[in-house]
Amino acid sequence: MDVIDELPRAEFAFPGPLRDRLVAAILSGAKTSTSALLVGYERANEPLPEVGERAAVVDSEDRRVAVIETTEVRVLRLADVDLQHALDEGEGDESVAQWRAGHETFWHSAEVRAELGDPGFTVDDDTLVVTERFQLVHTI
């Protein structure tokens, strides 16, 4: 077994076009941050990422394509996410409002609501978000 196979998986969005775009942005170096709902970690009983932790990025075909290392983790109110974080997500957003609109659409999707087990889930200014900065260590 290769060392890469022992690393935890870093999955961005759900398999499909969005994941493909996010993985491409990671591989190009454009994406150096991400965000997730704190409630998602809690419902899955998963620990938050930790600084120095490495993970294998998986693509839509479930292949490990890169290794990233966490460099910062913050838990913030959705209203407190800053412009630098939004820009560093590498999705082309030019403002926090644009970033938030895109993320609200994703977080209100049927897939996220199903994953959370809450068909009526919505976010607001006080929703807690885990923001994570990472660096690309290498591609596979």
Regions found by a protein language model. Name each.
Residues 1-67, 73-140:
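Mixed-charge, low-complexity intrinsically disordered regions
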